[in-house]
Structures are given as structure tokens and as C-alpha cells.
């Protein structure tokens, strides 16, 4: 098998409708990225201590670099698949699979970590116990519920996401303004924003601060969700960059503001230990005013937005696996549809089970999930940046409706954006820090990637396709195409010697679970009566049947 381009012909049954505008995309993007602060703030404070706002700000700058890369690539290739699609155009199917498989781990962890963050917030409403058994058991129940909802065909509602995003933003703005006016002590906060200063309260070492910044990257994961919806976006060249700019601007302000006012009412040590699983509710519960009703309120909106984020992760798994399946990167069973509900039940079940297993393996530790989350997310982001740089160099004349700014010129035609270069280096360093310092996240992440590559190679060999080729899908459009449903197939037994016709009938029967009826017709000459005995021909017919 040579690593050459190959072509496969597919029947184009239906195009995704382009119905989403910039507001709907913003709602989806904010729902995925904005939900992360409800668990990422605690793990960031655990390491960055008093420098938590700085860590979030630095991670936010890297997020801007990544967001601009996705804005350019998603408008250049407005197709589902995200970084897997970008890598396919920039490299080949093998690199595309590695990027997509890492992204799939990211989606599975979105399901797991978002669902895992819900029970601690619900205790502010219902008073549930905070034991690991309740925490893990509640998470498994939530993921199971989401599986059945998606099995029956529940859709992601852009309007619900938009309303919830607005409620969350307004609630956080209220907290920042109220605490900023009544409680904020900036000289006190700034005095503790020191890094590597001995004998200073809340001053992390430089190594701790770097780990805290890496953890802060978790707060900005989820931008991939906008890229996944590129094929359903009206005017993607305008809507995608606009929604991404809105998302990154609002998140940077809110994240920095929440972290600053948070450290005005609670120590980073307490935030990273006692409230590591529910940092936002922990902050507002310490307010000298309104804490008794602010904590349940934030518990409610946190649970809702985290539930939507977890559900979006499960939907993202199915969208991504369907895109990869079209290019023969994963076996057909992963995107096989349920005969009744027309949903990818196998992939939904497999990924829901994997998410539950990961939660159980975490033993109730948010850090374990955050490390593994970073492992998959940074692989996806790294290949997105790398794909942009490679395509900018290989094909500078390619039509790009949106181009990342701050470019370094190379000759008259080529230019490379500084943001993509910075993003490439930063995401690789964060991924490397997980590999070096986080053995649990590293081991599980590497096992996931190795098993995926082995599956890919075996499947490609079975299909007699090149491992590193670049498969091209040629879609044939048929006006008013309607899918065929076969229940009964009639086979002329006189052509029983024609094995090709018989094999075709058997393959159709297997695909559609249809029955086959074989018929042997005996022609009677006009000169003979209809009931005339024709023993020899009847014997031949019986033999054929």
C-alpha cells in the first residue's frame, strides 16, 4: 500500500442545513468554554496561589492565539471535523487521525469532567453529601441520563444555550461589580501576586506557577465546538470569526474579574483545597452579603451550563466520529445508526461508558480529570496551529475568508501569523508538562493514543487503503434523493450460475435485513397445454433452487 492519494465515491444523501448565526455560535462556544471556569478555577488556584489571576491571564493570551487559528481554519474549511479536517488538508489521513483521536479524548473528557463538576454544585441546592461515593455515583447517573437522551434523538438547542449564556454572564458581571465596589482591595491582591518570592504568603514557586498556568489552560478549552458547527453556519466567513471574538473577549474579562474578586473574599489555599470542585459557589458563599442565596443560585446555573456542556461533548463525539468514519479512519460500527431512533447508538454507548470508566478511575479527584483533559485538548490545539502554518507555507494563494493577524512576511507571497507560532509552542509545552509531571494523565493518554493508532492501521489494512494517504471523497448528488428500504428481494434462479448477481442480492439482504425469495421459471411452449408434464425442466429447476 503506497502513501498516495485515493478516491472514494459516496452518494450525497443530505447536506447539513446552514441555520446558525453568530449569536447561536457564540452561545454554543460560551457554553463549552465558559462552563470550564466552574471547575478550572480551583485546580488553577491549587498551584498558582496568589498569582492565579496572572495564570488565567497568560492562559487567556494563549487562548486568543488558538481562537484566531480556529477562526481562520474554520472559515477556510467550513466542514465538520475541526482539527481532524484541518490536519487532513495540511498533511494526510494518518496525521488527521492522530489529531482527531486526541480531540475525541478531549470530547470524552468534556463529558466526564463537566458531569463530574455538577454534584458539588447541586449540594448548595439540595444539601447532598460531598462524599466520593455520592460524587462518582452522581456523575455516572448524569452521563447515563445524557446517553439515553441522545439515544432518543435529543438535539442541542442554540436558543437554550443563548439564554443560559446570557444569564451566566449577567450573574458573573453582577458578582464582579458588587464585590468590586464593596469588597475589592487591589493593593492587597497585588501584594500577593508575587511569584518565587520566599517568605511571602500565597507566593508560588516558578515551577508551581507554570503548573498553575498549565491548569488554567483547562479553563479555555472548548473552542473546538464552534469549528464542529462550521457546516451548519450561515455566512461562516463572517459568523465564525465574530462569534469567536465575542467569546474570547468576554471570557478574558470575566475570568480575570472573577479570580480577582474571589481572592478578595477567600484565600487561594482554601479555593484550591476546600472548594477545588466548586470554586465559584465557594467564592459567593463567603460574601458578607447575600451569600445564603447567591451560592444556591450559582449552584443552579453552574449545574445547568455544565449539563449542557457535558451533553455537547457527547454530541461532539458523534459528530467527530461520523466525520472520521467518512474517510475510513474508524470502523463502520462507530457511526452505525439505530434502526428506530436514527442516532449513532454504538458510538454514544461506547463513549458514555469510557467517560464513566474515566470518572471511576479518577477516584473522585478533579486533578486527574483536568490532567487528562489537558492531554487531549493540547494535542488538538497543537495540530490546529501546525496545520495553519503548513498550509500558509504550502499554499499561500489559498482563499482564506479570514486571516489571523500579526503576520511575519517571508518573501512576497508567504506570511506566518505570530499568534499561531506562539500557540504552537505554548500548547506543546503544556502537553509536555502533562507528560513529564502527570504520570496518571500521561499513562492513560498514551494508552488511548496507541490503541487508536493500532485500530486505525488494522482497519486501513483491512480496507486496503494507504496508511498515510490522503483519501478524497467524491460525492454524487442525486436530486430529491430518498433512502431505499428493502424488505424482500426476488432472485431469478435461472441466473444462479451468475455468482455476481447472487452476491449482490445477499449483500443487499444483509445490509437491509431483507428476505430473499428464489424463483425458477419454466417456459411452456404455446403448442403444449399449461399442465403438460416437463420432467426434465422441472428436475433442472429443483436442482437450481
What residue ranges belong to the model's regions?
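C-terminal membrane-solvent junction of multi-pass transporters and transport-like membrane proteins
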Residues: 160, 333-343, 381-434
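Membrane-interface "cap" regions at the ends of multi-pass membrane proteins
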Residues: 1-51, 64-68, 76-80, 88-89, ...
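Small/aliphatic-rich secondary-structure junction motif
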Residues: 481-539
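Extracellular loop-to-transmembrane helix junctions
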Residues: 17, 39-142, 247-251, 257
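TM-loop-TM module centered on a large, flexible mid-protein loop between adjacent transmembrane helices
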Residues: 92, 124-128, 196, 243-311, ...
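Membrane-interface loop-to-helix entry segments
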Residues: 135-188, 244-248, 370-384, 439-453
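A generic transmembrane alpha-helix motif of multi-pass inner-membrane proteins
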Residues: 372-377, 409-467
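Helix-loop-helix junctions that connect adjacent transmembrane segments
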Residues: 11-15, 132, 163-239, 243-296
Amino acid at each position: 500500500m503506497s502513501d498516495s492519494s485515493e478516491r472514494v465515491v459516496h452518494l450525497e444523501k443530505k447536506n447539513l442545513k446552514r441555520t446558525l448565526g453568530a449569536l447561536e455560535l457564540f452561545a454554543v462556544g460560551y457554553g463549552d468554554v465558559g462552563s470550564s471556569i466552574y471547575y478550572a478555577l480551583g485546580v488553577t488556584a491549587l498551584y498558582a496561589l496568589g498569582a492565579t489571576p496572572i495564570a488565567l491571564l497568560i492562559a487567556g493570551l494563549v487562548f486568543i492565539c488558538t481562537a484566531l487559528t480556529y477562526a481562520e481554519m474554520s472559515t477556510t474549511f467550513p466542514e465538520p471535523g475541526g482539527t481532524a479536517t484541518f490536519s487532513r488538508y495540511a498533511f494526510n489521513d494518518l496525521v488527521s487521525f492522530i489529531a482527531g483521536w486526541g480531540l475525541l479524548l478531549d470530547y470524552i473528557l468534556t463529558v466526564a469532567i463537566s458531569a463530574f463538576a455538577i454534584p458539588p454544585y447541586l449540594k448548595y441546592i439540595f444539601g447532598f453529601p460531598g462524599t466520593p461515593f455520592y460524587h462518582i455515583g452522581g456523575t455516572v447517573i448524569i452521563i447515563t441520563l445524557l446517553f439515553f437522551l441522545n439515544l432518543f434523538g435529543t438535539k442541542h438547542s442554540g436558543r437554550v444555550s443563548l439564554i443560559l449564556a446570557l444569564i451566566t454572564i449577567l450573574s458573573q458581571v453582577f458578582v464582579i461589580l458588587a464585590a468590586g465596589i464593596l469588597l475589592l482591595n487591589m493593593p492587597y491582591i497585588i501584594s500577593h501576586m508575587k511569584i518565587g518570592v520566599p517568605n511571602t504568603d500565597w507566593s508560588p514557586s516558578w515551577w508551581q506557577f507554570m503548573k498553575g498556568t498549565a491548569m488554567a489552560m483547562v479553563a479555555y478549552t472548548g473552542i473546538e465546538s464552534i469549528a464542529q458547527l462550521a457546516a451548519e453556519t450561515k455566512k461562516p466567513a463572517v459568523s465564525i470569526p465574530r462569534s469567536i471574538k465575542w467569546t474570547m473577549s468576554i471570557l478574558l474579562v470575566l475570568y480575570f474579574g472573577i479570580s480577582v474578586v474571589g481572592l478578595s473574599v477567600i484565600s487561594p489555599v482554601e479555593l484550591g483545597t476546600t472548594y477545588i470542585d466548586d470554586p465559584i459557589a465557594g467564592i459567593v458563599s463567603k460574601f458578607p452579603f447575600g451569600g445564603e442565596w447567591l451560592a444556591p443560585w450559582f449552584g443552579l446555573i453552574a449545574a445547568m451550563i455544565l449539563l449542557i456542556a457535558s451533553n455537547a461533548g457527547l454530541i461532539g463525539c458523534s459528530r467527530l466520529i461520523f466525520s472520521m468514519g467518512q474517510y475510513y479512519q474508524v470502523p463502520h460500527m462507530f457511526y452505525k445508526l439505530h434502526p428506530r431512533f436514527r442516532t449513532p447508538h454504538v458510538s454514544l454507548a461506547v463513549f458514555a461508558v469510557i467517560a464513566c470508566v474515566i470518572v471511576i478511575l479518577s477516584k473522585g479527584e478533579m486533578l486527574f480529570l483536568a490532567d487528562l483533559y489537558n492531554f487531549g485538548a493540547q494535542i488538538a490545539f497543537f495540530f490546529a496551529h501546525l496545520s495553519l502554518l503548513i498550509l500558509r507555507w504550502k499554499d499561500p494563494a489559498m482563499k482564506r475568508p479570514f486571516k489571523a493577524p500579526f503576520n511575519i512576511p517571508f518573501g512576497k507571497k508567504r506570511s506566518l501569523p505570530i499568534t499561531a507560532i506562539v500557540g504552537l509552542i505554548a500548547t506543546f509545552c503544556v502537553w509536555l508538562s502533562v507528560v513529564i509531571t502527570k504520570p496518571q494523565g500521561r499513562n492513560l493518554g498514551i494508552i488511548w493514543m496507541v490503541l487508536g493508532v493500532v485500530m486505525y492501521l488494522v482497519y486501513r489494512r483491512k480496507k486496503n487503503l494507504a496508511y498515510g494517504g490522503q483519501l478524497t471523497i467524491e460525492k454524487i448528488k442525486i436530486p430529491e434523493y430518498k433512502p431505499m428500504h428493502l424488505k424482500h428481494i426476488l432472485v431469478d434462479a435461472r441466473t444462479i450460475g451468475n455468482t455476481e448477481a447472487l452476491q449482490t442480492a445477499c449483500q443487499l439482504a444483509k445490509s437491509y435485513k431483507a428476505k430473499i425469495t428464489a424463483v425458477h421459471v419454466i417456459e411452456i411452449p404455446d403448442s403444449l397445454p399449461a399442465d403438460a408434464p416437463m420432467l426434465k425442466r422441472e428436475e433442472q429447476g429443483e436442482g437450481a433452487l
